[in-house]
UniProtKB/Swiss-Prot annotation:
Regulation of this protein's activity per its record: Binding to PMPCA is required for catalytic activity.
Homology family: Belongs to the peptidase M16 family.
Transit peptide stretch: 1-45
Record's protein name: Mitochondrial-processing peptidase subunit beta
Species assigned in the record: Mus musculus
The reaction(s) this protein catalyses: Release of N-terminal transit peptides from precursor proteins imported into the mitochondrion, typically with Arg in position P2
Swiss-Prot/TrEMBL keywords: Hydrolase, Metal-binding, Metalloprotease, Mitochondrion, Protease, Transit peptide, Zinc
Enzyme Commission number(s) of this protein: 3.4.24.64
Subcellular location per the Swiss-Prot or TrEMBL entry: Mitochondrion matrix
Gene it is expressed from: Pmpcb
């Protein structure tokens, strides 16, 4: 539901590139702009409902070719503008898996109008940043610049997605870069575990493949593959031009018409359908007793962005929460699981997640444990899941709802996260959901709703499990599945 909010609780699933001042820098996802509240300060779960004030309207216009233009003008001196494209690794097959990510790498390697050096110098002289990332269902290119440079930023974005040269020399050079990136990803155990989790949960489907693709594909992708991907997927109805900050919607609309009105023709045939991705309860275990800690993810099948149960699962996700040893401990932690984990010294950290795609999702927990506590930690996690289905209280749900709303609003801080929120929501829902509407949907969730929805998705369901490290004491899959069942009143 809250596309921007959800992404903060998810584990890494996108690969980004940031260009600014001619060097690459990592960019973490931030969130959107400050929001103002009326009424007294929120002091407890019984506090009066808050009213969001001074939220600029999100204006949306659709061009004749299907491209949607959406913007929010907050009067800042800077702006973020970008292209959100309904195309990612899920639209690939086994042979071309990795093409979307490869294409993202090629975006800033020169166009028919600008060499790579010219592009870097122009961005540097503007004091701007160019960014791109690929996820399983979306590809994004965006720029952050001064508001006065909005026309130049839009023109550059249009140039790089429509006129990239895709030179053979650049392709070969980037091939090596991606292979080195794959080696770096393999050292990030959290990403490795989540790739394993997708591979086992969505076996032999597009969501089960990695975003980077297998090594053999990276070594064989050629210019024709990249051009074919652009021709198939970079079409008007599948693209959103989103902007936030100091932007005028009418100006943005005219820029969109000028740069995209004729070039991005609409589909002559049907838009390629999303390949169905069936969830399979199963596991992947990679035992390595030389590793100091065990890394484990367990998840059940959840729902897509627009499903009515999404909000309730977000609240349940907040109820489970997250914890790290650096947080300290005590019985006043908001998460019951955090209290038990801290008191029993069961793990180094855990993080709940609710990953939503168009028509499916993963709801679960990622944990890092000592070898001796893996079984105990998993047992406590499953007991907490059971408690969500049977014994969660109204006060706990009220606290989780307030925490969820607070986190969502705190994430909306700046033009870049607002722009990301607009772009994602336009692709997911074809509109930007107003914050008051989202708050009302969260407020409608009560303890009975949480118990009912969690029972629907957790009770007697076979989970997907990915485990890496010293996992000798991890219970076998049948035992884990049996612990997903309990006697209900």
């Amino acid at each position: 539901m809250a596309a921007a909010a959800l992404s903060r609780t998810l584990l890494p699933e996108a690969r980004r590139r940031l260009w600014g001042f001619t060097r690459r820098l990592p960019l973490r996802r931030a969130a959107a702009q400050p929001l103002y509240f009326g009424g007294d300060r929120l002091r407890s779960t019984q506090a009066a409902p808050q009213v969001v004030l001074n939220v600029p309207e999100t204006q949306v216009t659709c061009l004749e070719n299907g491209l949607r233009v959406a913007s929010e003008n907050s009067g800042l001196s800077t702006c973020t503008v970008g292209l959100w494209i309904d195309a990612g690794s899920r639209y690939e097959n086994e042979k071309n898996n990795g093409t979307a990510h490869f294409l993202e790498h090629m975006a800033f390697k020169g166009t028919k109008k600008r060499s790579q050096l010219d592009l870097e110098l122009e961005i540097e002289n503007m004091g701007a940043h160019l960014n791109a990332y690929t996820s399983r269902e979306q590809t994004v290119y965006y720029a952050k610049a001064f508001s006065r440079d909005l026309p130049r930023a839009v023109e550059i974005l249009a140039d790089i997605i429509q006129n990239s040269t895709l030179g053979e020399a650049e392709i070969e050079r980037e091939r090596g870069v991606i292979l080195r990136e794959m080696q770096e990803v393999e050292t990030n155990l959290q990403e490795v575990v989540f790739d394993y989790l997708h591979a086992t949960a969505y076996q032999n489907t597009a969501l089960g493949r990695t975003i980077l693709g297998p090594t053999e594909n990276i070594k064989s992708i050629n210019r024709k593959d990249l051009v074919d991907y652009i021709t198939t997927h970079y079409k008007g109805p599948r693209i959103v031009l989103a902007a936030a900050g100091g932007v005028c919607h009418n100006e943005l609309l005219e820029l969109a018409k000028f740069h995209f009105g004729d070039s991005l023709c609409s589909h002559k045939g049907a838009i390629p359908a999303l390949p169905p991705c069936k969830f399979t309860g199963s596991e992947i275990r990679v035992r390595d007793d030389k590793m100091p800690l065990a890394h484990l993810a367990i998840a059940v099948e959840a729902v897509g962005w627009a499903h009515p149960d999404t909000i309730c699962l977000m609240v349940a996700n907040t109820l489970i929460g997250n914890w790290d040893r650096s947080f300290g401990g005590g019985m006043n932690l908001s998460s019951k699981l955090a209290q038990l984990t801290c008191h029993g010294n069961l793990c180094h950290s855990f993080q709940s997640f609710n990953t939503s795609y168009t028509d499916t999702g993963l709801w679960g927990l990622y944990m890092v444990c000592e070898q001796a506590t893996v079984a105990d930690m998993l047992h406590v996690v499953q007991n907490e899941w059971k408690r969500l289905c049977t014994d969660v209280t109204e006060s706990e749900v009220a606290r989780a709802k307030n925490l969820l709303k607070t986190n969502m609003l705190l994430q909306l801080d700046g033009s870049t996260p607002i722009c990301e929120d607009i772009g994602r929501q336009m692709l997911c829902y074809n509109r930007r959901i107003p914050i008051p509407e989202l708050e009302a949907r969260i407020d409608a969730v009560d303890a009975e709703t949480v118990r009912r929805v969690c029972t629907k998705y957790i009770h007697d369901k076979s989970p997907a499990i990915a485990a890496l490290g010293p996992i000798e004491r991890l219970p076998d899959f049948n035992q884990i599945c049996s612990n997903m069942r309990w006697i209900r009143d």
